[in-house]
Amino acid sequence: MSQPKALLRRDGFTFKQFFVAHDRCAMKVGTDGILLGAWAPVAGVKRILDIGSGSGLLALMLAQRTEQHVTIDSVELDAQAANQASENAAESPWAERVQVQCADILAWAPEQTARYDLIVSNPPYYEPGVDCGTPEREQARYTGSLGHPALLAAAANLISEEGFFCVVLPENTGNTFIKTALDIGWFLRLRTDIADTDGKLPHRVLLALSPKEGECFSDRMVIRGPDQRYSEDYTALTQAFYLFM
């Protein structure tokens, strides 16, 4: 049920079915994460992994989109963010399905024996040298903290035979990410280029990679129409989450 705007908490983001506190997280809830959480394919999945979970946004969105038997593991390096993600999960309707680990994915991954049907990540993409303000934001945004080749290799060791590894990245970075992925044996299966409006070039790209070869489906989405309202496509994708949509 929608709440009056005056009653909304200011330390996070209120969705229709859950609240994400993010005041102790370097990276706040934003459009990139919401796009990825609403877009990632979930048909038939049983186990989901969120790499670099931050506030736990993706895990909670995917919990909302999946059946009760689906379990979700979140791995986050920063202790403050991991603690907040755990609290967010505990206060959500899916507390029993979401588990948060405070760990370095590169150390955590080799210890795992189970495989995941879906892995998601909103990974760092800034090169070292860009001022991010705090060490926590640098860790969350610099590729130096988790390089894309290392991320792809870790995901490859954790993905099921027909699973998908989904990310959101800036357009140019995404093209480089695809090349790196193809070079180490991934196949691109889904791609959605995101633009603010029809008249603008895409600025983000959603990618789904798989260890299994198959046809690649590509499309384009604009966030806002000519009247600056959310587009029909963006509304259809995200209206299950946004409180006032």
Swiss-Prot record:
Keywords: Cytoplasm, Methyltransferase, S-adenosyl-L-methionine, Transferase, tRNA processing
UniProt xrefs under Gene3D superfamilies: Vaccinia Virus protein VP39 (3.40.50.150)
Compartments where located: Cytoplasm
Listed EC numbers: 2.1.1.223
Catalytic reactions on record: adenosine(37) in tRNA1(Val) + S-adenosyl-L-methionine = N(6)-methyladenosine(37) in tRNA1(Val) + S-adenosyl-L-homocysteine + H(+)
Top-rank taxon, per record: Bacteria
Chief subcellular location: cytoplasm
Family indicated by similarity: Belongs to the methyltransferase superfamily. tRNA (adenine-N(6)-)-methyltransferase family.
Function: Specifically methylates the adenine in position 37 of tRNA(1)(Val) (anticodon cmo5UAC).
Descriptive protein name: tRNA1(Val) (adenine(37)-N6)-methyltransferase
Source species: Enterobacter sp. (strain 638)
